[in-house]
Amino acid sequence: MDWKTIFMNISIDSVIIYTWDKYWVIIPRDHVERLLWGELIQLYREKCFNNVFVLNWPGGFTNLRVWTLCLNILNTLLENQLSFYNLSKIDLFKKAYEKWFLPRFWVIYIWQKRNIRLWDFENNEKIWQYSFSELEDLEEVKKFENVFVEDVQDMEYYPKWMDKYLKYHTLLNWTDIYLVDNKTADWKWISIDEFKLKPLKSISPNYMMEPSVTIK
């Protein structure tokens, strides 16, 4: 990636855009369908970026769907001048776990109240999936140690007993990804080059959802 790269985290409830000169925009999911296209066009006019690094999925349906659609449309209008670099949070956090930066288990909330999951980075698999109301009452879940959650704008989606767990938020820049502990302000970093990402001309949302119907 060259220096004219913008960085987007579209996998949280309020999408964050960073640029090489520290310009950044936050767009809440409640306004994304109304504001995104105008913000994206204005950003391109001001910055004339060549590359887009996207921290993608798991995340909310609206953000993933609208952002990937608008990015693809923009690249079509620009006759494929843009290159996308796509990284999932599961791949990011797995790398962080392997470096001893993060605990083994991650409580994932993908912005549907029936889809709160526990991910095991040791075995790289989902252990369980519950609704929000079920999660409030699960004593066996409360006994889990070595767990973290991602800091988001709307923390009310997590049960109060999860306050004891580590909360991390993610920052991006030209060369590195930073993981910041909200309680201690300690931070760790991972070089983007470690992921050996290939340039893409289009980008797809991955909703981390299994089909609910079978077509015969």
Locate the predicted segments by residue.
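Oxyanion-binding and handling regions
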Residues: 1-20, 31-35, 45, 83-216
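Glycine/charged-rich beta-loop-alpha catalytic/anionic-binding loops adjacent to active sites
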Residues: 22-24, 51-55, 156-159
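Conserved short-loop catalytic and cofactor-binding motifs
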Residues: 24, 58, 196
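Catalytic-loop motifs flanking and including active-site residues across diverse enzymes
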Residues: 36, 66-70, 89
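N-terminal small/polar loop signature for handling phosphorylated ligands or for N-terminal nucleophile
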Residues: 38-42, 49
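DPxDG-like acidic metal-binding loop motif
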Residues: 51-56, 62-84
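Residue-level signal for short, function-critical loop segments
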Residues: 57-58, 211
